[in-house]
């Protein structure tokens, strides 16, 4: 052995050390001197000596038995629950509650999971629905403004009387086209939202005759729709009334895949930015104030806030066709500034 004595040593090492101490004491060394040479605390040596006499020199296994540890019968009940209810409950969380529901054992979900893992058992779980293939845009869609609108609702729960806000964002230009505050999510709100958006973009006038004379509209007309509305699979999006309204106004519908919010990323991103950058909206309780604030935020979002996804111009710039010129002016300005700095720092002969 060499070096300091570790904090834990086995019984064989202790026996060797105690033998060295005995030999040194017989040779006339004091206990303190030999312990100092061995870098061993004297109290530790005395404790080993007493344990050697009692036959307990070997350390007990590390750890202990916590006073809140499971009892044997509880572990047995967990395993029994697995056999009886595992195929029904499918998860350790439900199985833990099944134990108390049946009055057999009261344990937490993590305890059930740990006991089953220790026994090499595994619950089948509920398989995730397979993610479908993303549908491509229809062939008639063009990558320009007012061709792709993405829409969805968000919730502002502090405004109890009208907590739901619908919004539409233009996928190409990222303009926040329209928004309405309402108390419920039905096809009626969808109609109001889209009529407001169409009017704001100057598209409603050409479609008004369809609303005035719906009986004269040929719903089987194969002419390209005026635009494509992208949404998730909410009830008001899929309802027959909404479908009929969209068909009347020649608005195509495109639904994202279930459990895949990325398919509606444009509107999800809009609401995320709105709430993160304007947290006061989440504290407003008066619907009239909330509606005014949302309209103010919408105006700022469209005309002031620079949007990264469209090259750091405002959505209004992109929507009105100024985006390319602004981005070009920046590139030209950067190049000119670089040349000016080089000229200023270039040493003169």
Regions found by a protein language model. Name each.
Residues 1-44, 49-61, 77:
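Residue-centric detector for conserved, function-critical "anchor" positions
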Residues 24-28, 85-88, 201:
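Short coil/turn helix-boundary motifs
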Residues 106-108, 121-122, 136-167, 171-300:
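RNase H-like DDE/DDD metal-dependent nuclease/strand-transfer catalytic core used by mobile genetic elements
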